[in-house]
Amino acid sequence: MRIYLVAGELSGDILGAGLMQALKRRHPDAEFRGIGGPRMLAEGMQSLYPLETLSVMGLVEVLKHLPGLIKVRRHLRRDALAWQPDVMIGIDAPDFNLGLERQLRATGMRTVHYVSPSVWAWRQGRVKTIARSVDAMLTFLPFEAAFYARHQVPVAFVGHPLADELPLVNDRQAARTALGLSSTAPLLAVLPGSRGNEIRFLGPTFLDSAVWLRERVPGLQVVIPAASPARRQELEVLLATHPAREFVHLRDGESRQAMTAADAVLLASGTAALEAMLCHRPMVVAYKMAAATHWLAKRMVKTEWISLPNLIAQETLVPELVQEDASCEAIGEALLTWLGDETHRQATETRFAALHATLQRGASERAAEAIDSLVVHGRLPEEPTA
C-alpha cells in the first residue's frame, strides 16, 4: 500500500507517526511519502520538505510567503500524481491541505483529512469546500462527527490521542508529592495560557483572583505551570510586584502534574481545558482579548460554548467567563463554588471520567481502520464509532 501524508507542524508529526505505526501493523509493506517530521521519518517516511515548511509559511507572514506555499503545493500535487498512492492523508494544516486534497480528489485519488478544522465554530460555509475535498474526515471529538454527518460528509469519530495518553484513573496525592506540595491543603492550579497575549490579558486578573480566593480559603496553595521559558519570564515580572508572590508556586511546564494535583483549575480556553477534563478536575474557564477581536469573535463564532468540556458534553459543566464577565470577583466566586462543595466537585470529576472513557478509543488504530476500509472497500466502516 502506498500512502501520501502531509503534516504541517509538530503536533501533526506526532499524529502522523502514530498513524503510520498503526497502518504498518495492518500493511507491513506500506510505503509513505509526502511531508513529515523526525517522528514520521523514523517510521519510514520519505519527506520532500522539512516539517517546518508549512508551519512557518502557513502561520507566519502568510502573504509574504504565499508564492512559495503555492509552489510547494504544486510540487506535491505533481509528485503525488506521479507516485500514484492508494490514498492521500492531510494531517491538520487545513489551509494548506484541503486545497491539495481537493486538487488530488478531482483526479480520482482518494483523500482523507485527519483532525477537523474548527468549521463547526466559525465559517461554517467551509464545510461545502471540505465536502468537495475529502472522501472522509477523521475527527477527534463526537460533536465534530455529528456536524459533518448533518452535512453529508463521510466521517469517522476516532477518539482523541490525548485521551489515549492520559490514564482513566489518576493519583492526586502522588502528583502533589512530585510537586513538593501539601497533601492536605486545598490546591488551585492556574494556567493563564501559552501565548504572550494571554499572559498580558489574563495574568493580572488570574493573580488577583488567586488573592481574592486565598482570603476566603485559608491555607490555599496555588501552583502556576509556565508553558515556556518566555511565559515564565512574563509571569515572574507580574509576580514581582503582586501580593500573590507570597504563596504562588511557579513551575516550568508540569501542567499535567499540576492539574492532577489540584482540587480546581483556573485556565484560559483551549486545549488546556480538554486536558483538565481528562485529568478529571473541575475548572473555571476565563478569557479576555482585545476589544476589536472580541467584537469580531462574537459575530463569527456560532457555538453556544467556547470550552471543549462543555462542547463535548453539549451542556454547561464548567463556568465560562469572557471579557467583562471575567472579573476577579466573578472568577473567585466560581472557584469558591468548586472548592466549597465537595459533592458537586466529586460528581463533576465522575462525569469527566465518563467523558474521558468516551474519547479513549485508540485514535491511531481507529484512524488506520477507517483508512484501510476506505482503500480496500471504498467506504468507511459501517459503524466507525462502535
From Swiss-Prot:
Belongs to the LpxB family. It is an enzyme of class 2 (transferase). GO terms for molecular function: lipid-A-disaccharide synthase activity; phospholipid binding. Condensation of UDP-2,3-diacylglucosamine and 2,3-diacylglucosamine-1-phosphate to form lipid A disaccharide, a precursor of lipid A, a phosphorylated glycolipid that anchors the lipopolysaccharide to the outer membrane of the cell. It catalyses: a lipid X + a UDP-2-N,3-O-bis[(3R)-3-hydroxyacyl]-alpha-D-glucosamine = a lipid A disaccharide + UDP + H(+). PANTHER family: LIPID-A-DISACCHARIDE SYNTHASE (PTHR30372), LIPID-A-DISACCHARIDE SYNTHASE, MITOCHONDRIAL-RELATED (PTHR30372:SF4). GO terms for biological process: lipid A biosynthetic process. Pathway: Bacterial outer membrane biogenesis; LPS lipid A biosynthesis. InterPro entries: Glyco_trans_19. Keywords: Glycosyltransferase, Lipid A biosynthesis, Lipid biosynthesis, Lipid metabolism, Transferase. Its EC number is 2.4.1.182. Pfam families: LpxB. The gene is lpxB. This is Lipid-A-disaccharide synthase. GO terms for cellular component: membrane. It comes from Chromohalobacter salexigens (strain ATCC BAA-138 / DSM 3043 / CIP 106854 / NCIMB 13768 / 1H11). It comes from the Bacteria.
